[in-house]
Amino acid sequence: GPLYFIYKIISVLKLCKTLEKEYPDNNFVPTFWLASEDHGEGEISKINIFGKSFEWEHSEKGASGKRGAVPYSKIDSELRELFKEDDQAQEILNIFTESYSGAKDLTHATRSYLYKLFGEYGLVVIDGDDIKLKGEFASIMKEELLNSSTKQKVSETIARYGQNYKIQANVREINLFYLGNNFRERIVKE
């Protein structure tokens, strides 16, 4: 959920530091892929802290990053009460409030929050829904759409290594989605 991605980022930052020591002639850039095109409501709309669940509701569908700002004010006072004796937690809540209160959508809010928390450590946040990034990726998307290239490569990899590893996700014939205002639909070959 929303707290786990912070743990993942800290792990990447630590890994980069370890690799820089082990390979001093190389530079390692901590990178976080912001899954702004995903739909993972269950992953992003609820946190559990000390057995208490905090959840934000929304009616929007489609890509999670395009959703309007998080209605955090509903849970802000509860979180502040929970951490009232912890100055560091209050500081993090202040950064969260500053990042999410004026943002136009979830992508901008989350990017702001991450840069405020981890920017000084060199974290780079990549937004999968960025139009320029998609432009660079256009030939790969075309290949996927016409030739199901991901399915072919993943099937080869599973055939080679599958018996030694648990498969985490099943590949589909076309691994692309059509995104529009308030919807996200899988592209299916007919």
For every predicted segment, state its role.
Residues 1-190:
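N-terminal targeting/trafficking signals and adjacent low-complexity tails
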